[in-house]
Amino acid sequence: GPIPEVLKNYMDAQYYGEIGIGTPPQCFTVVFDTGSSNLWVPSIHCKLLDIACWIHHKYNSGKSSTYVKNGTTFAIHYGSGSLSGYLSSQDTVSVPCNSALSGVGGIKVERQTFGEATKQPGLTFIAAKFDGILGMAYPRISVNNVVPVFDNLMQQKLVDKDIFSFYLNRDPGAQPGGELMLGGIDSKYYKGSLDYHNVTRKAYWQIHMNQVAVGSSLTLCKGGCEAIVDTGTSLIVGQPEEVRELGKAIGAVPLIQGEYMIPCEKVPSLPDVTVTLGGKKYKLSSENYTLKVSQAGQTICLSGFMGMDIPPPGGPLWILGDVFIGRYYTVFDRDLNRVGLAEAA
């Protein structure tokens, strides 16, 4: 049957779960990221200057009986940080890490090629609560054409249905923080029925978006645009000029790097934002599209919409990140190449 993987939620901004690599399994926390296609974790061979490496779990190939050396070098670039190291090798990936302990039958994906990261520049990965990233997008965007974990999982016939589904809890204090269901759909996490939207380009989980309406006054993505559904992005990302207009409409103040803040007392009176996909309307209330961020006793309210340019050939694209997925339970269907959405329970 389907395998549930429990996720932890850190401040509504990072969702991650535990996997094992090697025999016996070495445990790592990873972001299950539908916006990329590679798996990487920090390496025991990381450079001394790599601070991110000091504070995270590290893979030691010498301790695994199923390790196969590969050694090709690689570099991966994300929206927020880049990473270089070497394409380590092949080994067995277990989800969850120790299935015997969790009482759920887990799965083991054999001969999975992944990256052992030896260099992680910048602050991006130091602040991360997770060790690595497990990409769940299509093979087309996999660096070095490595076969992604879910593709290997399908080929090894480890699930009955070639689908996986995400529930992301938007209450940072509540348990569980979320759930990734491999090979199925967990009906306890949504209400009503699922509506499906066809993938328009099999690279990211890309679908067609009809429009984004802010209250009754402003329409963005007029005449339609393309959007990707991305569990690895915290916010909803749009083109800078469109998000600037949206910011004006909701009284948001530009912060840095395309992010905006909103005076917390204004949040309850802000208009709904409605995303239309395939003729279905997906409403987000101001409570859904704002994030409360507390630091040093101060609470600020961050807009859930961020402006960022995604240039051709991939872009221009909107990104429907955790702000959206938290409100709408999401099914990623590799069998029929479609994305299913229903209101999260």
UniProtKB/Swiss-Prot annotation:
SS bond partners: 46-53, 221-225, 264-301
Family statement: Belongs to the peptidase A1 family.
Cell compartments where the protein resides: Lysosome; Melanosome; Secreted, Extracellular space
PANTHER family per record: BETA-SITE APP-CLEAVING ENZYME, ISOFORM A-RELATED, CATHEPSIN D
UniProt keywords, alphabetically: Aspartyl protease, Disulfide bond, Glycoprotein, Hydrolase, Lysosome, Protease, Secreted, Zymogen
Protein name: Cathepsin D
Organism annotation: Sus scrofa
Post-translational modification (record): N- and O-glycosylated.
GO molecular function: aspartic-type endopeptidase activity
Assembly with partners or alone: Consists of a light chain and a heavy chain. Interacts with ADAM30; this leads to activation of CTSD. Interacts with GRN; stabilizes CTSD; increases its proteolytic activity.
GO annotation, cellular component aspect: extracellular space; lysosome; melanosome
Catalyzed reaction equations: Specificity similar to, but narrower than, that of pepsin A. Does not cleave the 4-Gln-|-His-5 bond in B chain of insulin
Chain positions listed as propeptide in the UniProt record: 99-103
Gene behind the chain: CTSD
